[in-house]
């Protein structure tokens, strides 16, 4: 995720609000139930503080480049300490950060990447503010990604 939302910042639990409901519905399609996922896997965000509402009122504001740069050492240290075999990158900013380059969601979601010896699986952000999933071809990208999660990622991380 790019940053905690207001609810997540208050309760200190990632994907705690409506975006979380949608994300965990997706993960359930791949065989991962929310309670088990939260118990077994580490969740973090590119930035660590709630960035505030988007000026146009559609969701939360994207963290600035300066905010991302300030938080980058913390994210890198988290990855160093956790040493994940795989990373589920949720949302455009998380995907861009983990892959180290800009990439269109249509080109990333539904594909697996290898970065620093880790399997990276991009997912779109589950925010209701995102219109990306309104297109049937993008729903197909998400379905492919969830298939990769079930068939490739889960066996890898549970080995």
PLM regions and their residue ranges:
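A polyanion-binding, active-site-adjacent surface
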Residues: 2-158
């Amino acid at each position: 995720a790019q940053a905690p939302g207001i609810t997540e910042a208050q309760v200190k639990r990632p994907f705690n609000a409506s975006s979380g409901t949608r994300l965990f519905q997706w993960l359930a399609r791949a065989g991962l139930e929310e309670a088990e996922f939260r118990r077994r896997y580490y969740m973090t965000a590119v930035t660590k503080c709630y960035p505030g509402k988007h000026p146009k009122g559609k969701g939360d504001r994207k963290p600035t480049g300066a905010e991302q740069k300030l938080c980058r050492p913390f994210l890198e240290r988290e990855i160093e300490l956790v040493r994940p075999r795989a990373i589920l990158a949720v949302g455009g900013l998380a995907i861009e950060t983990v892959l180290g380059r800009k990439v269109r969601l249509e080109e990333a979601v539904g594909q697996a990447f290898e970065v620093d010896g880790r399997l990276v699986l991009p997912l779109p952000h589950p925010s209701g503010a995102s219109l990306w999933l309104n297109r049937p071809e993008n729903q197909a990208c998400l379905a492919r990604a969830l298939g990769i999660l079930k068939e490739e990622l889960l066996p890898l991380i549970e080995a």
